[in-house]
Regions:
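Active-site glycine-rich loop that binds ribose-phosphate moieties when present
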Residues: 134, 141-148, 168-191
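Active-site-adjacent elements of ketosynthase-type condensing enzymes
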Residues: 111-118, 163-184, 214-233, 279-288, ...
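Condensing-enzyme catalytic core mediating Claisen C-C bond formation in acyl metabolism
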Residues: 1-75, 160, 175-250, 254-258, ...
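Conserved beta-ketoacyl condensing-enzyme motif
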Residues: 42, 46-125, 131, 136, ...
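Claisen-condensing/thiolase-fold acyl-transfer catalytic domains that form or cleave C-C bonds
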Residues: 107-109, 118-121, 126-128, 133-154, ...
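Short coil/turn connectors at secondary-structure junctions
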Residues: 1-2, 96-100, 127-130, 155-161, ...
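Phosphate/pyrophosphate-binding loops at sites that engage ATP/ADP/AMP, CoA/4′-phosphopantetheine
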Residues: 84-99, 205, 254-271, 322-329
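Short acidic, glycine/serine/threonine-rich loops at helix termini
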Residues: 15-18, 113-117, 144-147, 172-177, ...
Length: 353
């Protein structure tokens, strides 16, 4: 089986409490003299205490050119990405030249050559390293990325595969956009990165991380406009439909139950739920749909409060936090990692701790 050898998360360099970000959004998104009570309510309701940003807050008001924004994305993604991969390899006791596959995912910027290509020489990866850059999966890509590592390592069990997620959500900030979707997005999303190192069944490692048993993808018909981007002259304009939690409530239980049943398991057998921190309403919907105890998603809620929603990096930070001392589930028991994203879709990954 695929074994997760290390998970390493990093955050963008500038930390701000929620009130500072709310004030910045009010200055740049609301008309002069506008009533900001709706904005304040949305930002309080996100239950986010602090977030990290790629740039100092006073730089965002001047970012009105998509090219300049994307240049900032590339520079920030390379820096955070290098830190995340180097940290994960160090924790796994492996060197950059051990890496056979590097999967890179982000939905907050674009690059050609891709960020993984820009990192290869800097990190010291082999010239024959296989690379797979992904775009468009959004928040689901952390879970889907682990699933794709597992797919590769089933076919190449002597390989080492790395997933790198970098999301600089603050760089998608849309000035003068007072739409509910944009105001909600400015309340939730933060900047960070994470790297996962995984080893195939025939690759000997001293790592004691969980094994990946299986994964399953679900794409729901006629939901394309629930979540994603509209690409505009000023960059990425968020699409965020308030019906997202309802879709989760309607579909998630059946998807999870069917997946677990195929492996002789039920929800009661799962000792830890590693859920993407999409926001309070999404976490409530997951809890209600699966009839989980109120504290089942405490690690996800704590991550949301401390760093916000990191898009695809979020569930990887939560996996890392779940594996820390005092939180790690009993060895050999099942765990379920799950995330949702544009499509609308979910990705489920069955783990064994």
């Amino acid at each position: 089986m695929t074994r997760i050898a290390a998970v390493h998360g990093v955050l963008a360099p500038h930390r701000h409490v929620q009130r500072e970000i709310t004030d910045m959004v009010a200055r740049h998104c609301l008309p002069a003299g506008a009533d900001r009570r709706v904005l304040d309510r949305l930002h309080r309701g996100a239950l986010v205490r602090s977030r990290h940003t790629a740039l100092p807050l006073d730089r965002y008001g001047a970012l009105d050119d998509f090219g300049a924004v994307n240049d900032a994305f590339i520079a920030g993604a390379v820096e955070l990405g290098a830190e995340a991969v180097a940290g994960a390899l160090d924790e796994a006791g492996l060197s950059p030249r051990d890496v056979d596959l590097l999967v890179f995912t982000s939905v907050t910027g674009i690059a050609a050559p891709s960020v993984d290509a820009r990192l290869a020489g800097r990190l010291g990866l082999r010239p024959d390293v296989r690379r797979l850059p992904l775009f468009g999966l959004g928040c689901v890509a952390g879970a889907a990325g682990i699933a794709r590592l597992h797919d590769h390592l089933r076919g190449w069990p002597d390989h080492v595969a790395v997933l790198l997620s970098v999301e600089l959500c603050s760089l998608t900030f849309q000035r003068a956009d007072a739409s509910p979707a944009n105001l909600v997005a400015t309340a939730l999303f933060g900047d960070g990165a994470a790297a996962v190192v995984a080893c195939g069944a025939r690759r000997h490692t001293a790592a004691s991380g969980p094994t990946v048993v299986a994964s399953r993808s679900h794409l729901y018909p006629d939901t394309e406009r629930l979540l994603g981007w509209d690409i505009t002259g000023s960059g990425f304009r968020v699409v965020l439909d308030p019906a997202v939690p309802d879709v989760v409530r309607k579909n998630l239980a059946g998807d999870v139950d069917g997946f677990l049943s195929d492996h002789g398991l039920t929800r009661r057998d799962v000792t830890a739920w590693v859920s993407h921190a999409g926001g309070p309403k999404v976490l409530d919907a997951v809890t209600e749909a699966l009839d989980l105890p109120e504290d089942a998603l405490d690690v996800s809620r704590a991550s949301l409060a401390e760093v916000g929603n990191l898009s695809s990096s979020s569930v990887l930070h939560i996996l890392r936090d779940t594996l820390t001392a005092g939180r790690r589930p009993p060895a050999g028991t099942p765990g379920l990692l799950l995330a949702m994203g544009p499509g609308f879709c979910t990705e489920l990954v069955l783990l064994r701790w």
